């Protein structure tokens, strides 16, 4: 009896063990699909991430190539620009140096001219002082028997009288012209000499029949500021030459014989003649 009980017990235990093993196997078989799905999801995510990374790398590589090409193109343009700028810079430098040199030369020339002018003024002033005490001083810029006033030398024909044409010829022989009055100062100066020498004299002014006007020997017109319109209107075609008297000009026959005055530019006063 006890043997039967023991056998029955063993059979029940074996049966229970078999069922337990079957249940465990069934549980393992049921759990495998869940793990496989999880791995597939992870793999898909990794593949997607790799695809995104590859796409990003390709995009970055494309952008890098584009930027590299742009840099190379800009470098070539910069190089060409530098090549074109260098000659311009050289030309600009040469022009600047030339301008500086020109300005320096002009400045020096201006200073030299100013110094020479100042020297001439001082020499002229000293010479006039010397001539007050010695009329024949060697610094005199005018020939002997000539009078020096301003920038001109004057020759007064004190003891001679000639026609206008002969007077003009005499002045030409002296490398001068019949006097031309350019300013009120010169007019007043000549007027002051009349009381000392003579009362009237020929002018280098004559009637131009073709132009129907009065002209100085250099072809210029007598200024209306020196002689009134009334005085100019007093001229007529029968009297073709002009003379000066008491501060005015008058017309006369050119054949009339009266004194005359020659005029020419005074020479520069030499500093070595001031000794």
UniProtKB/Swiss-Prot annotation:
Q: Which UniProt keywords apply?
A: Cell membrane, Disulfide bond, Glycoprotein, Lectin, Membrane, Phosphoprotein, Receptor, Signal-anchor, Transmembrane, Transmembrane helix
Record's bilayer topology term: Single-pass type II membrane protein
Q: Which CDD domains match?
A: CLECT_NK_receptors_like
Q: Has keyword Nucleus?
A: no
Motif location (ITIM motif)? 5-10
- Post-translational modification Phosphotyrosine, affected residues: 7
Task: Present the record's domain note.
Answer: Contains 1 copy of a cytoplasmic motif that is referred to as the immunoreceptor tyrosine-based inhibitor motif (ITIM). This motif is involved in modulation of cellular responses. The phosphorylated ITIM motif can bind the SH2 domain of several SH2-containing phosphatases.
Q: Record keywords: Transmembrane helix included? A: yes
Q: How does it assemble?
A: Homodimer. Interacts (via ITIM motif) with PTPN6. Interacts (via ITIM motif) with PTPN11; this interaction triggers dephosphorylation and activation of PTPN11.
List, alphabetically, the Gene3D superfamilies matched: Mannose-Binding Protein A, subunit A
> What species is this protein from?
Mus musculus
Give a GO molecular function annotation for the protein: signaling receptor regulator activity
Which stretches are Extracellular in the membrane topology? Answer: 65-275
- From the record, give the cysteines joined by S-S bonds: 171-262, 241-254
Which one Pfam family would you cite for this protein?
Answer: Lectin_C
Cytoplasmic face of the membrane: 1-41
Q: Which InterPro entries match?
A: C-type_lectin-like, C-type_lectin-like/link_sf, CLEC12A/B, CTDL_fold, Ly49_N, NKR-like_CTLD
Q: What is this protein called?
A: C-type lectin domain family 12 member B
Q: Which GO terms describe its cellular component?
A: plasma membrane
Lineage of the species this protein comes from: Eukaryota, Metazoa, Chordata, Craniata, Vertebrata
